[in-house]
Amino acid sequence: MAARDAGPASGPARRPNRRPSRQPTRRKRRAPDPIKAWVKRLDRTRPDLVRDVLDALASIHGRPTWERRLDPTSELILTILTQNSADINAEKAFEALRAAYPSGLPAERHNPGRGWGGAGLPDGAPPDWDAVERAPLEELVEVIRPGGLPNQKAKGILATLRAIRERRGDHSLEFLADLPALEARDWLTSISGIGKKTASVLLMFSFGMPLMAVDRHVDRVAHRVGLLPKKASADDAHDYFLAMLQPEEVYEAHVNLIRHGRLICQARSPRHELCPLRARCRFVDPAAP
């Protein structure tokens, strides 16, 4: 008997060859930058607000000109001493550092400018930062006690000086003058305990870099007028200001917003009758243009 035809061998079905798709790969859309979006919205819905605010503040506070305040390391330590303390008390603590750890270097002048809330430091040499870093914690606490919060600040000062020396070999921060502003800020904020505000104060007042330092006065005035979104934190505010201000406007804006917050736009009892911003202030009138 003839054998039956077994037919084709069984196995997995072969897929037909397909030509590769020529459609381009769809790129993921980037989320919009909230800071740039806010600035564009502000320009569209409240035109000339930034310019009007700067001009109004200048009409009563003048147009300050930049002058180097202190060497950068002294500026950094003085800024740490001002945290949650009055400027005049920070001056007392810094003077105590000068007296306890004299460096013998030439005296330098403190140019506090209009944004400073103290009397200004007398001329004097910076402290010996090597000696400060080597000081026992308990000793340093007592030296800076006039500035307030001495335990917290002494630890911060020692840690900061140590971090700078370990990275640079000494305590000088003059090298920051050669870096782009944001790169210099990033270098400083990479040190534990130094935030955008402290870094911006140092870079603005020691080198004239166009970095906005946002303290409670700047933050309060800007939120009340409507320059910043309601939910913007003080930390975020640094970058909002950089997006809305020209570099040559930053120093004037910082100094005059601080003065306005201290003298007129006070936290508890703002003096609306004296305020040149009231026509455009959303705190006075939520519908202000």
For each of these PLM feature ranges, what is it?
Residues 34-289:
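Catalytic cores of DNA base-excision repair glycosylases
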